[in-house]
């Protein structure tokens, strides 16, 4: 019996970082949706993903903080990792108060940490080991 693939939503406007994050996810799941704006993400949010990776600065009218506030209003309980280059203390403090599980500075050097965090969060929330070494085709 095949394990259910974790559903991960990535909200990131930078195409380079979209690709880099997808590379970190390739051995974890194939069930990934990428959104470039907070508006598109919220408009297409029809089910509860197992994990959301969210940037702060996004194209469009709303930023990652606004997306997170809207998720809380809608009572979504999906774990959220903030992966952003915005490290202002006021932003970080506000986001942590809204319940993100991790805030990771967005650089190419922190991508391994992002992958480790994703694996740990999925194992914790899904109650099963997440296989990061091979695909189940």
What are these regions (language model features)?
Residues 6, 37, 62-66:
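Acidic catalytic/metal-coordinating carboxylates
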Residues 14-39:
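Two-component/phosphorelay signaling modules centered on CheY-like receiver
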Residues 34-51, 56-59:
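Acidic, metal-coordinating helix/loop segments flanking the phosphotransfer/catalytic sites
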Residues 63-76:
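Short amphipathic alpha-helix used as the core "switch/output" element in two-component signaling
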Residues 86-87:
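Short, conserved "switch-loop" micro-motifs in signal-transduction and mechanochemical regulators
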Residues 95-101:
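As written
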Residues 113-126:
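Receiver (REC) domain switch/output surface
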């Amino acid at each position: 019996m095949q394990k259910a693939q974790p559903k991960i939503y990535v909200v990131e406007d930078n195409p380079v970082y979209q690709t880099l994050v997808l590379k970190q996810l390739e051995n974890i799941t194939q069930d990934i949706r990428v959104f470039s704006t907070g508006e598109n993400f919220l408009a297409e949010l029809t089910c509860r993903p197992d994990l959301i990776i969210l940037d702060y600065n996004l194209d469009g009218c709303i930023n990652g903080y606004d997306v997170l506030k809207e998720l809380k209003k809608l009572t979504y309980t999906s774990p959220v990792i903030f992966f952003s280059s915005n490290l202002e203390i006021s932003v970080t403090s506000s986001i942590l108060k809204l319940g993100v599980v991790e805030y990771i500075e967005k650089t190419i050097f922190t991508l391994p940490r992002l992958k480790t965090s994703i694996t740990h969060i999925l194992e914790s929330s899904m109650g099963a080991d997440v296989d990061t070494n091979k695909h189940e085709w």
